[in-house]
Amino acid sequence: MTATAAVLLDAEAHPVIAHRGASAFAPENTLVGFERAAAFGAEAFELDVHVTADDQPVVIHDPTLDRTTDRRGVVRLMPYAAFRDADAGARFTTDRGATFPFQGLGVRVPLLAEVLGMFAETPFIVEIKAVAAAQAVKRVITESGAMSRCVVASFDERALAPFDAPPWIRSASRAETLSLLSRALVGRAARPSRYRALAIPTRFNGIPIPMRMLAGAARRIGCPTHVWVIDSPEVAMSLWKQGVAGVITNRPGAMLAARDAGAAE
């Protein structure tokens, strides 16, 4: 059976989506982090993509290597070969720097193609972090045969423009999300949209999002709402009760346990 993004497009489902992998337990946006998420039973993965100087989409959140590896430099200005062997486990710690359990273990910044290939049955939210990466991401998803299981996301509508037409699946940009919310606040119906899901934080510019209202407006046009980053089981349960579909979390095991316990009550 061909894997699809169905669980990410069903407003009635409550998927647990691993944020950059199981990033409370392993380095974010790495193969080992995604392996840990799979072991916990996460039903989809969220990841971030930048593009290198030689047009290779790589899975990393920041525009630079500085925070998550033992190297420094701007990803967009370097060919992948220049940092292929950077240690992406060097800075990961769960005890405020007392230990670095993944340092020196060969953890690397992976190519998007590697992640899609290794987890060929997993749905993904692929967040494009820079407009310059959009075409390269489109190429790699196409070459990987992963179009049906990827929801492409970005804050920037320009990065999403290449994914507007079917069979591509994309989420709402920040501007589209705010437009949906503003119309809901004044009781106006949503306009026809090119997006098929929302992927949002709990706050915009420090202001709490009226989640029940926004999720309800999205559901009326057939769009599920996925919320990040949720690491509290109590918050996850509250969001699900407000009509949110998925939670994007660093702790997929805890969220799955909370969801399943709630379903059994």
Label every PLM stretch briefly.
Residues 20-21, 28-30, 154, 174-176, ...:
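Glycine-rich beta-to-alpha transition loops that act as phosphate-gripper elements at the mouths
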